[in-house]
Each structure stands twice: as C-alpha cells, then as structure tokens.
C-alpha cells in the first residue's frame, strides 16, 4: 500500500469514528471528542480515554484504551490487530462500550 493509500484509508477510519461519536452524543452518550492532527481522543463521562492515532511509518492505526495498547494493519480490506487478527471497529466497539458503560457500535 502506498503512503497516499494508507493516509486515505486511515483518515476514513478517523472520520467514521468522529461521525459515530457525534451520532452517539445525540442520544444517551456524553463523549468528548478531540482531534489533534492524526490523533483522536475520546473522553468518556467517567474520565477514561481512548486514543486512536495514525502511525504512517508503519502504515498502522493504534488504539490506547483501558484494555491496553493495540496495533492495526490493513489486511484483505480490513484493519486487523497485528497480534490477534481482531477487526478494528469490532474491537473499538468493545473498548468504548466498556468505558462508556453504554453500548456504542462503530462501523467502517
């Protein structure tokens, strides 16, 4: 994957996360969302955070959550955990639901 392709795919992920959080905040959620360059920080009512950032040199997306730190690489059309193979949006759904205390579903 070229650098241009990586950036387009990774930026699309961040945009999708932003749209999902905006929609969730229209409902029962209260999630603060801050974007600083290629870093997206979600802060939940209980003060916990999930940080998603781009890693262009490695062509990866990283998630830092209460559950730990996770690296994702684009494989066969999806962002997959480099250790477990878990799909990015599925994992983010689990981490955010745990930290928010309310269900929230992320999709590509």
Swiss-Prot record:
Q: Which InterPro entries match?
A: CyaY (IPR047584), Frataxin/CyaY (IPR002908), Frataxin/CyaY_sf (IPR036524), Frataxin_CS (IPR020895)
Q: Which UniProt keywords apply?
A: Iron, Metal-binding
Query: Per the record, GO CC terms?
Result: cytosol
Q: Which GO terms describe its biological process?
A: iron-sulfur cluster assembly
In its UniProt record, a GO molecular function of this protein is:
ferric iron binding
- Please give the family membership noted in the entry: Belongs to the frataxin family.
Write out the function statement from the record: Involved in iron-sulfur (Fe-S) cluster assembly. May act as a regulator of Fe-S biogenesis.
- Name of the protein: Iron-sulfur cluster assembly protein CyaY
Specify the species. Burkholderia ambifaria (strain MC40-6)
């Amino acid at each position: 994957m070229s650098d241009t392709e990586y950036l387009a795919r990774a930026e699309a992920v961040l945009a999708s996360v932003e749209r999902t959080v905006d929609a969730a905040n229209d409902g029962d959620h209260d999630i603060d969302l801050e974007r600083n360059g290629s870093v997206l920080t979600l802060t939940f009512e209980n003060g916990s955070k999930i940080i998603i950032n781009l890693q262009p040199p490695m062509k990866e997306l990283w998630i830092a959550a209460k559950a730990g730190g996770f690296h994702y690489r684009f494989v066969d059309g999806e962002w997959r955990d480099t250790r477990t193979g878990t799909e990015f949006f599925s994992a983010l759904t689990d981490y955010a639901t745990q930290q928010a205390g309310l269900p929230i579903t992320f999709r590509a």
